[in-house]
Amino acid sequence: MEIQFLGTGAGSPSKSRNVSSLALKLLDERNEVWLFDAGEGTQHQILQTAIRPRKIAKVFITHLHGDHIFGLPGFLASRSNQGGTDPLTIYGPSGIEDFVKTSLKVSQSHLSYPLKFVLLQHPGVAFEDQTFKVTFDRLDHRITSFGFRIEEKPHPGELLIDKVRAAKIPSGPVYAALKAGETVTLPDGRIFDGHDFIGPAQPGRTVAIFGDTRMCNRALPLAAGADVLVHESTFGPDESQLAKQYYHATNVQAAALAKRAGVGRLLLNHISARYLSPGVAMLEKTARQIFPNTHVVKDFEEINIPFRSEQSEPAVTVKS
């Protein structure tokens, strides 16, 4: 599981940061990539990465401001032009379906794959299967803006092979049955419960990805205990009144939430073009005074999210 940031800027693109988009890469877990937001130029950013558009199976839209959606129709059309045939599902607020369908209709773009929309209204579960669960709630922005909580379900424990051998259970298909937790009967009449030969389940990982928001109580349960929290940082530490006025957050407000929620690592994005390198360093430094495991991300940066049993300090490794 990895997050790759495709756009980390706020409002408008700059020379160093494109507008909002990130990819949650689940290639080992599902052979898929999930896209969160698709600001203008997202497909250009994807070209600079190893991400294959046909691998993108889901797109989650936090809200309908242009810097989060203007790149979506172009990406969808290019995915089709590049031979994509696998279905794609878009999750987002009411209005996203009209926006996409109107854009495709006016431009006479025809997709080569099925496109499904899941319109998110009442807080709850956006998606769930045997391996992942995605929940959402409304945050506090000028328009409807969502935060998403992506939870990987626990992985079954490993077969305790030494214990199996100590019981003198012959190798073969019976091992698979034991690992599946089944009760097996051997030719010699001995009966074994597979659960007795399975180690503890491995906890899954949790990532919280927020759209634009100012501080609100609904953010806490979405972020609680997450391995990684991705949170906007449009304003600096001394601009809380501006943040409130414009429905955004400061870096130190995000850090306070991360501390309160007990997350593993805080990743700050949605960085204003007003902050050049010295300013970005200041955002990171002042946030770390509240929550030490904070990092201000940049475009194309990749964040690996290991299982908790594999983690050492820091909890998440950063590659650029």
UniProtKB/Swiss-Prot annotation:
What does it do? Zinc phosphodiesterase, which displays some tRNA 3'-processing endonuclease activity. Probably involved in tRNA maturation, by removing a 3'-trailer from precursor tRNA.
What note does UniProt attach to the cofactor annotation? Binds 2 Zn(2+) ions.
The UniProt annotation places Zn(2+) 2 binding at 67-68, 212, 270
Can you tell me which residues bind Zn(2+) 1?
63, 65, 141, 212
**What EC number(s) does this enzyme carry?**
3.1.26.11
> SUPFAM superfamilies, alphabetically?
Metallo-hydrolase/oxidoreductase
* Stored HAMAP family: RNase_Z_BN (MF_01818)
Pfam families annotated for this entry?
Lactamase_B
Family note: Belongs to the RNase Z family.
Q: Report the Gene3D superfamilies cross-referenced here.
A: Ribonuclease Z/Hydroxyacylglutathione hydrolase-like
- Cofactor section: Zn(2+)
Where on the tree of life does the source sit, at the highest rank?
Bacteria
Q: Which reaction does it catalyse?
A: Endonucleolytic cleavage of RNA, removing extra 3' nucleotides from tRNA precursor, generating 3' termini of tRNAs. A 3'-hydroxy group is left at the tRNA terminus and a 5'-phosphoryl group is left at the trailer molecule
Q: Where is the active site?
A: 67
Q: What is the recorded name of this protein?
A: Ribonuclease Z
Keywords (alphabetical) are:
Endonuclease, Hydrolase, Metal-binding, Nuclease, tRNA processing, Zinc
Q: How does it assemble?
A: Homodimer.
Molecular function in Gene Ontology = 3'-tRNA processing endoribonuclease activity; zinc ion binding
